[in-house]
């Protein structure tokens, strides 16, 4: 089996259906005997350039280990789903399990906010 990194962008009006789409796509990979090493929902983000007059999209990242047939099936599902604006499937040399740069930055921001909240409460109490 080979390792793949998959990123797909969903129409912002379809953000509510992203969880179902992720479940469907991961299900098709696991049914074919593949495994999901990393799954990150980056949420709605600004795009670098407009696509179909849209400036935002819902981003999802998956790192999987699967056979080529399952990846072909997934690519076909992306192609026929109108809600998927763009997708990218790259073959990688090994499984990537650590958080991506996007998620690391998000975790750092939330940690800073959590650290700042007790300090603000202490300053208000004095």
From Swiss-Prot:
Gene Ontology cellular-component terms listed:
cytosolic small ribosomal subunit
In its UniProt record, a GO molecular function of this protein is: small ribosomal subunit rRNA binding
> Which InterPro entries does the UniProt entry name for this protein?
Ribosomal_bS6, Ribosomal_bS6_sf, Ribosomal_S6_plastid/chlpt, Transl_elong_EF1B/ribsomal_bS6
- Would I find Transport among this entry's keywords? no
Tell me which UniProt keywords the record has, alphabetically: Ribonucleoprotein, Ribosomal protein, RNA-binding, rRNA-binding
Q: Which SUPFAM superfamilies match?
A: Ribosomal protein S6
Q: Name one Pfam family in it.
A: Ribosomal_S6
Indicate what this protein is called per its UniProt record.
Small ribosomal subunit protein bS6
């Amino acid at each position: 089996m080979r390792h793949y990194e998959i990123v797909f962008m969903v129409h912002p009006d379809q953000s509510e259906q992203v969880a179902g789409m992720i479940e469907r796509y991961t299900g098709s990979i696991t049914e074919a005997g593949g495994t999901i090493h990393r799954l990150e929902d980056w949420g709605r983000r600004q795009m670098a350039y407009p696509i179909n007059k849209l400036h935002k999209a819902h981003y999802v990242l998956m790192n999987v280990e699967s056979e080529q047939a399952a990846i072909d099936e997934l690519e076909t599902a992306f192609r026929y789903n109108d809600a998927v604006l763009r997708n990218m499937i790259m073959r990688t040399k090994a499984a990537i399990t650590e958080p991506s740069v996007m998620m690391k930055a998000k975790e750092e921001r939330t940690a800073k906010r959590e650290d700042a909240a007790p300090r603000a409460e202490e300053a208000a109490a004095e």
